[in-house]
Amino acid sequence: MIYATGDLHRNPLRFQSQYFPEQAEMTKNDYMIVCGDAGLVWHGDKSGDPQLDRLEALPFTILFVDGNHENFDALSEYPVEQWHGGKVHKICLHVIHLTRGQAFELQGRMFFTMGGAQSHDIADGILDMESSDFYGQYDSLCRNRGQFRINHISWWQEELPSDEECAEARQTLDRLDWKVDYIITHCAPTAIQQKVNADFKPDKLTDFLEEIRCRSRFHYWLFGHYHDNRIIDEKYVLLYEQMVRVL
């Protein structure tokens, strides 16, 4: 069995048995895919995290692509390993980060992954703790309820993929003749994002995903980011707190 869900934001309450009774029939060979913003290594501590211990104790394996609200400094500390045909970071034995531009064969189906998204809650800017006027800016923005984040504390430029990651994604899809069963991302391709919320502006990543949407053949595209549960044009599945069966 394979299930998918949307943003966790470090709150995996939905995986408790009263909310997800289907897990009674699952094993570690079954998967729950989180479509970004999992936040499971937010504090960067590789050991002694009771939440990771609780997730490891679940009967299924958790897979996640990264979103924009991730600690990319912490994720990069994990060694890159090969798993089911693609590159991963193993956070725990059964909590696994599926990296960008990869393809994984899971239960006889091919899954292409491309995490990341541009933050939309930074209208008032990104603060740098090394700046001489950081505390003045911080206090002012807090008093005025500003929308801001702090570099390497609550925001990372790695939220958007590098040119190298996009090139690797194209190479992966070239190898597969641009045909996969499922595409897992955090944000949506530009055309689909406009149908979700026309107020969101295209960016480097949504335009790249639009290229993938136009060139590839796939059954379903699952994504998160927009905090809603909807199906768009029959094959694009936007997930937030819902958990849906994929296989």
Tell me the role of every PLM-derived stretch:
Residues 1-13, 132-134, 144:
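Acidic, histidine-bearing metal-coordination/catalytic regions of metal-dependent phosphoesterases
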Residues 5, 10-106, 198, 202-209, ...:
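Core catalytic region of metal-dependent phosphoesterases/phosphodiesterases
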Residues 43, 73, 122, 193-194, ...:
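Generic domain-boundary/flexible-linker signal
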